[in-house]
Amino acid sequence: MTESPSPSAEAAAASRAPVGLFEAFLFWLKLGFISFGGPAGQIAIMHQELVERRRWISEKRFLHALNYCMVLPGPEAQQLATYIGWLMHRTWGGVIAGGLFVLPSLFVLIGLSWLYVAFGEVPVVAGLFYGIKPAVTAIVVHAAHRIGSRALKNGWLWAIAAASFVAIFALNLPFPLIVLAAAVIGYIGGRLLPGKFALGGGHGAAKTSYGPALIDDDTPTPEHARFRWPHLLRLCVIGAALWLLPMGLLAAAFGWQGTLTQMGWFFTKAALLTFGGAYAVLPYVYQGAVGHYGWLSPTQMIDGLALGETTPGPLIMVVAFVGFVGGYVHPMFGADHPFLAGAVAASLVTWFTFLPSFLFILAGGPLVESTHNELKFTAPLTGITAAVVGVILNLALFFGYHVLWPQGFSGAFDWPSALIAVAAAVALFRFKRGVIQVLFACALAGLAVHLLRG
């Protein structure tokens, strides 16, 4: 039952001074270092800090902002931080909030990626990753189940998921084509069968009041958050310049076929396809980074996902690992500077991956608000989310194949890896253990197996 705040509480909120930009900066910096647990955990942390504890924003406005971010491609937790920062402190507030959500993870991943590339063959490190690989397979299966249980609400959506699995597994169709087809089916389904394609997985109305907030239910929309065509045009021009300038410099310095140039182009496309979160776009990253460009091996891709799971920030930051390894093994600054090449590649990949996400919030936030909950906009997302389930299942099979048959089907079946994968699945599904706990336990199990084998 919702409790109404007392008049004294309302008066206290009204007299409270606004949060300064520096105070907000310190909070967003802290959040960047503690944002473990994937999007659900990160959103829970923000809710606890911003809604319940600090009262910077009300429950209703928080969920309203989260629903906007759910409609956009990109990591919803990072976009939510950007949105709230923008709502509180204009454009710079959004840039600071979203940037600090990502930067700690980038620095940590650059360091871990270097340790992985430089010392990955050391027995202890190799043993830890031997146990982590089957755990990642179980984690991806769990992600498919989690998203599917929320998204596949009827037979039509199940059919889309099955078709997307066949399309990528049997027909090897490109991931962007699958997303486009699912969006078209969702749009048509929304017109013909609106009840079957209503947006699912969103967040409902607020049911709890934690007292008055600085940005409360009835607080008017700030002037800077109101939609204006000139403002939208200006931000689109700035965004285009922020993309074209580094791409132009890369093309001029390394040529269009250069590693860094191709990374910038590839991850720009990947950023526009992240409906459903990082697990949804990983098959596309695999198709390009592993299959087409050869920036890293299938085994390295699995290890990179494990590193992404154990660091703060969005899981899509696994792209920084892909960039680092690709730059490290294709050193464009000479054979004596592989770390510099890897660090630059990881930073550029992060820039091109997250630039669209910032623009969607800063330029499109007011526009998205004006179209929120209209079926013609949300039905395509429903179709895409259903397709994502089939794509993630394919990713799980891909990981499982490389983990359980490391030498291919003609080689031996890896029974210890299979047992570790089953144990990880039981821990996730039956005992509801966290991802980091599962990875840690499986890493120790893998180390034990590796040492026993000698």
Over which residues does each language-model region extend?
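Multi-pass membrane proteins that catalyze or facilitate reactions on polyprenyl-/lipid-phosphate substrates
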Residues: 1-72, 83-311, 315-454
